[in-house]
Amino acid sequence: IGEEQYFASRQMQGGDFVVDPELAAYVASVGNELAHESDLALPYEFVVLNNSVPNAWALPGGKIGVNRGLLLELDSEAELAAVLGHEIVHAAAGHGAQAMQRGMILQGVLLATSVAAQSSEYSGLAIGAAGIGAQLLNQRYSRNAELEADGYGLVYLAAAGYDPQAVITLQETFVRLSEGK
């Protein structure tokens, strides 16, 4: 799945940031240090994207993108390592693939509920309840995936020799950025 979506995902995020090849090499170098600590050896690939939005993402199979907007907000290499460690866990654990699979299953459940309740006077209520249930289930799994990525990402960060405090300063940066919205 990751390989199939990788090119399209990069293009949708503004394309590769080709102005500074040294920056791309630096990000890949830090990423590869952390990937070496990962529990799953994948052909990790790190790319800097020409997008001003502070964000990073991972696809199954080890494809990881970091927006240049996020790089501008980071204060240290350790914070970059914290971001990349987190994304490595998402890629290694297949969180993206699991979310897509869950989404397809939940869509099927909603469709089945819609068809089954079609002739009932309570069809709107049944479909609404199924939709809310699906949303709550998806949020729980998303929260668990984030906690897993935070936990193992911290382990990889420390194993690679970075200061674990960077995870805290990175979270403070994310809080500051979210307050600006």
Predicted regions and their residues:
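A Zn2+-metalloprotease active-site environment signal
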Residues: I1-K181
